[in-house]
């Protein structure tokens, strides 16, 4: 894993964003109430899942999130972390925050 460098992702406090080289995946890593979280939004996708969870009246299926527990979820969100101004995380490189790391690969973005 590469250490987080100021010249890599855009960073403000404990929030920074980045995108895949294709621009199809945009991610943000941040701390909330002392816990680290990572979220990635897909610009274009073809889901294999179709059942929206009960209680989710917002957008669902285009955002994935992982918290300090390490459990990944499809997020029910009313916003986006997509920002075309975010720097690119090149394939094979990684960023970390609070015990969570995201690695960019040609096959996608993996955050654990």
Regions inferred by a protein language model and the residue ranges of each:
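Residue-level signal for tight coil/turn positions that link beta-strands
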Residues: 22, 60, 68, 97-99, ...
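N-terminal secretory signal peptides
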Residues: 14-55
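Broad, structure-driven detector of short, well-ordered beta-strand segments within folded domains
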Residues: 25-29, 64, 100-102
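Acidic, glycine-rich flexible loop segments
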Residues: 78-112
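Sec/Tat signal peptide C-region and signal peptidase I cleavage site
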Residues: 8-12
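Residue-level signal for functionally critical sites in structured catalytic/ligand-binding pockets
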Residues: 21, 40-44, 66, 107, ...
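Bacterial N-terminal signal peptides
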Residues: 1-5
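A low-complexity, Ser/Thr/Gly/Pro-enriched, surface-exposed linker/loop concept
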Residues: 38-90
């Amino acid at each position: 894993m590469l250490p987080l460098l100021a010249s890599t992702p855009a960073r403000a406090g404990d929030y920074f964003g980045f995108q895949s080289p294709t621009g199809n995946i945009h991610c943000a890593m941040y701390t909330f109430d002392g816990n680290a979280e990572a979220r990635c939004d897909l610009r274009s996708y073809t889901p294999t899942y179709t059942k929206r969870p009960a209680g989710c009246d917002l957008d669902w299926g285009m955002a994935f999130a992982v918290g300090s527990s390490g459990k990944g979820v499809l997020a029910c969100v009313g916003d986006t972390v997509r920002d075309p101004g975010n720097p690119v995380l090149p394939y094979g490189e990684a960023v970390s925050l609070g015990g969570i790391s995201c690695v960019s690969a040609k096959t996608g973005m993996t955050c654990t």
